[in-house]
């Protein structure tokens, strides 16, 4: 029994008391849902209504605002945009060619500010933010064979934006939170500590809703992507070739596409659908543009280092498994093929830092920062090395440099709290910890530490 709990309180969770609670929870949950479930939009691919709380110019503005905060963080995680101006311009050109085919009936939110970048990440993937910011990884470009396949990749991501898939997922997550908020409201009104548990369930539910596209959404994106590429003059076989390529890569190395398939679930059904659509709906258009020569010419610098990218991918996998020595070795082998590659240098820095070799970590991260001044992750590793060395002033300097490029990052606030504490600046430390808890909550180990330090640093009356 908890301190202050009355004898018999637990009986409310059994027999008749349990039924009463369940009925009340359902009423509160329904009330929460009814306040939100007010809107639908027409899915441009299926022609059917889909639930979305985000609509019109207001909804579009919210999606653009959401992406504005998320893009810098994701791009930093992917080691920034490549310095290869030719590859970047080429991918953007293909993307704009597809966007130029769009009609008002193709989109939920008109006139999204589409943009296309290649990011340094070595895993095989492409992704879209709800404002139309679309990124293709170096790992993906190194595997593709022609421009038609690239058009299939970009068309697929454009279709996710046009169908409002992120808005729909956010709306479902909001209603889920409303249901949980209703539950939490009743439990809190009854003085129950179970309200905290209900809140935790809501956070987990929203995370699952927003984590990936559904198989149905993937089918819609495939259909839209093929439509756009055919309109732009590309051979629809490019979509089929892309899917077959991904299946081959996954068969040879399942971990290579783990990240992609976690957000873009692949299936034999998707491949069959694409083959059927090319053979029927687009039967007379299977001799469209493939443009292998243009693709190979514009991606030559990236494909030249394909062997290095595979070594870097191996290093990332080894880092995740805490095999720091092996990760450093793999990254160094990749650097022999691609000297001064930013990702390779950063992997050496991270493996060295995690393995306790701070001097080697600082050296590699400092070189990475010189190679790519806009590469934010180098500043993060330098800050962590400084913290481990108790160089708190240096840590704050590097954290501020990182924050200028990636504003609003929660972990930066946490590390700032540690650095300020190290300097004895309690008020600044408390402010930093408070910022971390506000952005990330107190459920993680870091969040619990920050919340605990907040209490301990509070002025004593």
Region annotations inferred by a language model:
Residues 3, 13, 17, 22-28, ...:
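Hydrophobic or amphipathic, alpha-helical segments that drive membrane association/targeting
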Residues 86-89, 93-94, 109-114, 119-121, ...:
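Extracytoplasmic
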Residues 145-149, 158-175, 187:
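Catalytic Zn2+-binding segment of zinc metalloproteases
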Residues 171-187, 197-209:
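Membrane-active amphipathic alpha-helices enriched in small hydrophobic residues
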Residues 91, 136, 156, 221, ...:
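Divalent metal-coordination and catalytic microenvironments
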Residues 154-163, 183, 220, 224:
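Active-site His/Glu-centered metal-binding helix of metallohydrolases
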Residues 56-57, 65, 80, 208-209, ...:
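Extracytoplasmic and endomembrane cell-envelope/extracellular-matrix remodeling and assembly machinery
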Residues 135-152:
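Short pre-active-site segment immediately N-terminal to the catalytic Zn-binding motif
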């Amino acid at each position: 029994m908890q301190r202050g709990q009355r004898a018999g309180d637990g009986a409310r969770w059994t027999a008749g008391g349990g039924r009463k609670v369940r009925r009340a929870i359902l009423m509160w949950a329904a009330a929460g849902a009814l306040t939100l479930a007010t809107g639908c939009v027409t899915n441009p691919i299926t022609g059917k209504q889909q639930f979305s709380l985000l609509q019109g110019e207001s909804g579009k503005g919210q999606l653009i605002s959401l992406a504005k905060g998320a893009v810098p963080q994701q791009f930093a995680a992917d080691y920034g945009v490549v310095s290869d101006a030719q590859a970047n311009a080429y991918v953007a050109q293909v993307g704009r060619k597809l966007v130029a085919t769009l009609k008002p009936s193709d989109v939920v939110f008109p006139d999204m500010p589409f943009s296309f970048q290649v990011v340094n990440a070595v895993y095989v993937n492409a992704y879209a933010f709800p404002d139309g910011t679309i990124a293709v990884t170096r790992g993906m470009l190194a595997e593709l064979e022609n421009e038609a396949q690239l058009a299939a990749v970009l068309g697929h991501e454009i279709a996710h934006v046009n169908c409002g898939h992120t808005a729909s997922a956010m709306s479902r997550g909001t209603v889920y939170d409303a249901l949980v908020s209703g539950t939490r409201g009743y439990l809190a009104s009854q003085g129950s500590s179970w309200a905290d548990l209900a809140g935790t369930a809501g956070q987990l539910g929203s995370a699952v809703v927003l984590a990936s596209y559904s198989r149905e959404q993937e089918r819609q994106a495939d259909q839209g992507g093929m439509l756009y590429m055919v309109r732009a003059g590309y051979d629809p076989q490019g979509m089929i070739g892309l899917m077959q390529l991904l299946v081959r890569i996954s068969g040879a190395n399942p971990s290579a596409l783990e990240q992609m398939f976690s957000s873009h679930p692949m299936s034999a059904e998707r491949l069959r659908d694409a083959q059927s659509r090319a053979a029927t709906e687009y039967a007379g258009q299977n001799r469209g543009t493939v443009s292998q020569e243009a693709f190979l010419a514009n991606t030559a610098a990236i494909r030249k280092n394909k062997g290095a990218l595979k070594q870097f991918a191996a290093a990332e996998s080894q880092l995740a498994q805490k095999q720091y020595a092996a990760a450093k070795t793999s990254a160094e082998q990749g650097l022999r093929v691609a000297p001064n590659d930013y990702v390779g240098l950063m992997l050496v820095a991270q493996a060295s830092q995690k393995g306790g070799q701070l001097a080697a970590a600082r050296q590699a991260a400092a070189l990475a920062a010189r190679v790519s001044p806009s590469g934010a992750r180098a500043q993060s590793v330098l800050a962590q090395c400084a913290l481990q060395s108790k160089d708190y002033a240096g840590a704050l300097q590097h954290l501020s440099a990182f924050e200028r490029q990636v504003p609003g990052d929660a972990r930066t606030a946490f590390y700032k709290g540690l650095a300020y504490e190290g300097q004895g600046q309690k008020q600044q430390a408390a402010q930093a910890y408070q910022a971390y808890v506000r952005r990330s909550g107190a459920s993680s180990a870091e969040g619990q530490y920050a919340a605990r330090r907040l209490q301990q640093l509070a002025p004593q009356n």
